[in-house]
C-alpha cells in the first residue's frame, strides 16, 4: 500500500512540474501509440510446430476452415515435407461438402490422394486401428464458440483415443469469433450427447485450445 501511494505521489508531482513549466498546459505526445491488432492463428506459427512434426508420421483432423493465408493446412504441410498418413474428417467432411447431420464415409481425398477417415458416422472416436502407425495427431478446425458445434466433441474423442494410444495431440488454436460473449445455461450432464459433451454454457467464450486444456 505504501509503495503504491508513493508511486502515485511521484506521478502527481511530475505532472505538476511539467504543467508549471508549460504555463499550466500539460504536454502530451504528438503521436498516438500504434497497437498491433493483427491475429496470428496457431496454424500460421510454423516456426514453432514444424520441428515437432519433422520425421513424424502425422494424422490431421481438419476441414475446409483449416487455412493458412488461403492455402489449406494439409497442402501447406505436404509442401513442407510433413509425412501426413491420413486425414480424419469431422461433421460436414474434410472439404466441407456434406450437410448438417449427414454421415461421412471413409474414402480418399481427390486432390491429395490421402486416406480420409470418418469421425462423423458409425465411428466418432478414432479406434486403435485408425491410429496405428501414427506418431502424432494435429487438430486444426475453426470453431464458433457454441456448445452444440460437434467439432469440440470430435476434439474430445480424438484426445481421449490418442491418450489411450499414448500418441501426442497438437492443437492449432484459432480465435473464437464469439469469445467476448458467454450466455446460456451450463449443460446438465444427464443430457450429455455428441452435441453437448461438456459442462459449459451454450455460448462458452473459449477457443478450442482453451477447451482442450480443460478436457
Predicted regions and their residues:
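Bacterial Sec-dependent N-terminal signal peptides
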Residues: 1-32
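N-terminal phosphate-binding or glycine-rich loops at protein starts, especially the Walker A/P-loop
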Residues: 38-83
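A short helix->loop->beta-strand "cap" motif at the edges of active sites that frequently abuts
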Residues: 82, 164-168
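Short internal beta-strands
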Residues: 85-93, 172
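Glycine-rich, charge-decorated loop segments at or immediately adjacent to ligand/cofactor-binding or catalytic sites
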Residues: 96-101, 170-192
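Glycine-rich oxoanion-binding loops at beta->alpha junctions
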Residues: 104-134, 146
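Glycine/threonine-rich flexible loop motifs
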Residues: 143-155
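Conserved anion/nucleotide-ligand pocket segment
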Residues: 192-215
Amino acid at each position: 500500500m505504501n509503495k503504491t501511494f508513493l508511486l502515485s505521489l511521484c506521478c502527481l508531482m511530475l505532472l505538476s512540474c511539467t504543467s508549471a513549466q508549460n504555463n499550466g498546459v500539460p504536454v502530451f505526445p504528438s503521436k498516438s501509440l500504434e497497437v498491433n491488432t493483427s491475429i496470428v492463428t496457431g496454424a500460421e506459427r510454423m516456426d514453432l510446430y514444424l520441428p515437432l512434426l519433422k520425421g513424424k508420421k502425422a494424422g490431421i483432423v481438419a476441414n475446409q476452415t483449416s487455412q493458412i493465408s488461403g492455402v489449406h493446412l494439409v497442402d501447406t504441410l505436404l509442401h513442407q515435407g510433413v509425412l501426413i498418413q491420413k486425414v480424419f474428417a469431422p461433421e460436414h467432411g474434410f472439404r466441407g461438402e456434406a450437410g448438417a447431420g449427414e454421415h461421412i464415409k471413409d474414402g480418399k481425398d481427390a486432390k491429395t490422394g490421402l486416406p480420409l477417415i470418418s469421425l462423423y458416422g458409425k465411428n466418432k472416436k478414432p479406434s486403435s486401428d485408425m491410429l496405428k502407425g501414427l506418431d502424432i495427431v494435429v487438430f486444426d478446425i475453426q470453431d464458433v464458440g457454441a456448445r452444440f458445434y460437434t467439432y469440440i466433441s470430435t476434439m474430445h474423442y480424438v484426445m481421449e483415443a490418442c491418450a489411450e494410444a499414448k500418441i501426442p495431440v497438437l492443437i492449432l488454436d484459432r480465435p473464437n469469433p464469439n469469445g467476448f460473449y458467454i450466455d446460456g445455461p451450463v449443460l446438465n450432464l444427464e443430457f450429455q450427447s455428441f452435441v453437448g459433451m461438456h459442462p459449459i454454457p451454450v455460448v462458452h467464450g473459449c477457443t478450442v485450445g482453451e477447451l482442450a486444456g480443460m478436457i
